[in-house]
């Protein structure tokens, strides 16, 4: 029960963070490209790499907190469904190049951000950052 409550509370925080952060990014850059969704997914990808690597290599993050941060907060922050819908709408609107750029950029950049999170965690744990 404690884990489920932790996940639920953190998920609410992640959802609010996504709402405000993506809205802020869209306000800055407009909606011609799904920059808001890309931004929250990139941040989430970096953070999950960082959190999971720290959790696997040390005892700095207790198991319940790890669940809250990864399943809860990152689950609420990131959004594959919105990415899918926005890409579908771009295709439906005939913006094939923009849709392909979004799909490719999202996958490649999210993997890169996860890798950066992992190497950041390793450097922090080894004290070489």
From Swiss-Prot:
| Alphabetic keyword roster | Cell inner membrane, Cell membrane, Ion channel, Ion transport, Membrane, Metal-binding, Sodium, Transmembrane, Transmembrane helix, Transport
Provide the reaction this enzyme catalyses: fluoride(in) = fluoride(out)
* Chief localisation class: membrane
Q: Identify its protein family.
A: Belongs to the fluoride channel Fluc/FEX (TC 1.A.43) family.
Q: HAMAP family this protein is in?
A: FluC (MF_00454)
Provide the function of this protein.
Answer: Fluoride-specific ion channel. Important for reducing fluoride concentration in the cell, thus reducing its toxicity.
What's the protein name? Answer: Fluoride-specific ion channel FluC
Q: What is the lineage of its organism?
A: Bacteria, Pseudomonadati, Thermodesulfobacteriota, Desulfuromonadia, Desulfuromonadales
């Amino acid at each position: 029960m404690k884990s489920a409550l932790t996940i639920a509370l953190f998920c609410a925080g992640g959802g609010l963070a996504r709402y405000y952060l993506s809205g802020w990014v869209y306000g800055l850059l407009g909606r011609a490209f799904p920059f808001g969704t890309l931004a929250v997914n990139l941040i989430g990808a970096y953070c999950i790499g960082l959190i999971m690597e720290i959790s696997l290599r040390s005892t700095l993050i207790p198991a319940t907190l790890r669940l809250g941060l990864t399943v809860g907060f990152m689950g609420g922050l990131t959004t594959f469904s919105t990415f899918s819908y926005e890409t579908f709408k771009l295709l439906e609107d005939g913006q094939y190049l923009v849709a392909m750029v979004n799909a490719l950029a999202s996958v490649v950049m999210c993997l890169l951000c996860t890798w950066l999170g992992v190497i950041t965690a390793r450097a922090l744990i080894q004290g070489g950052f």
